[in-house]
């Protein structure tokens, strides 16, 4: 009986001391917050996407499109220097197999070439496809998605 009691006390002490020692270890993760104080145009992010170059693209509703390289923010929007996007109401982004970023805006989608960082118009096979694509580019677009085959899917109204 006494032996059982002593073993219980030693076990409790061992568990308590070992769990207390764990608090002294450094954290495995470095957590930081990306907000307006860090350089974001606003604190609301609609979508976050990482491209093939490693840049993180943050879609903000009202703040445009933000590119983050892990250290600095580069903001793109309506009237931006360098790249002027069609709107500041960015919904989401995706990348196709040709290293183009498809950006969904309320005013319609827009395509950016990630190599040149300039807006581009995707080439079309024939005039029917081009006419349909022009119609789609004028409609509200809330989501874009690139599947494994390289097809671009858009949710628009």
Task: Annotate each PLM feature.
Residues 1-157:
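Carboxylate-rich, polar loop motifs that coordinate divalent cations or form catalytic acidic clusters
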